[in-house]
């Protein structure tokens, strides 16, 4: 009999390597009407960092680029920001994000998809840029990436 944290187990616990059970690396996606902010965790999930902003204004839906980034970084989890209303319900923006996420899962069925409440993530990103001495209005592309970092941070706090 084995004991773990005061709980008796009738079988020897299975030991899996961290790389087999870890949801990392993960890709954070901040989907917007004209841009998508992308961020990624490192392999251990210690630190998320900005990756790029995908411009949607020229007819691209960004799906192929997200696929390429996911494959290049060997991503296991897509963390998509879901814009909920202040009362926690889903509005039109959330429905658009879910529709986009469906396309992502059809294209990348081997990845785990997770939604995270992104309420105020762009405001938080703007505040962080301001604190760093950057003019947020002049840094729209960067704001989307920092918002994606914030989405990953929230998810990492949830799974910690």
Which positions does each model-derived feature cover?
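Phosphate- and other anionic-substrate recognition elements at nucleic-acid/protein interfaces
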Residues: 2-27, 34-160
């Amino acid at each position: 009999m084995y004991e773990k944290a005061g709980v008796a187990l009738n079988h020897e616990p299975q030991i899996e390597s961290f790389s087999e059970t870890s949801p990392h690396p993960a890709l954070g996606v901040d989907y917007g009407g004209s841009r998508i902010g992308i961020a990624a965790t490192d392999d251990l999930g210690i630190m998320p960092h900005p990756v790029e902003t995908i411009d949607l204004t020229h007819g691209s839906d960004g799906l192929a680029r997200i696929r390429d980034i996911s494959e290049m970084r060997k991503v296991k989890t897509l963390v998509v920001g879901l814009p909920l209303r202040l009362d926690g319900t889903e509005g039109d923006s959330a429905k658009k994000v879910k529709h986009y996420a469906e396309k992502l899962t059809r294209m990348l069925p081997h990845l785990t998809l997770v939604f995270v409440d992104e309420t105020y993530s762009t405001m938080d990103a703007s505040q962080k840029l301001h604190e760093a001495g950057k003019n947020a209005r002049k840094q729209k592309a960067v704001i989307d990436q920092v918002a994606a970092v914030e989405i990953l941070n929230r998810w990492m706090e949830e799974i910690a």
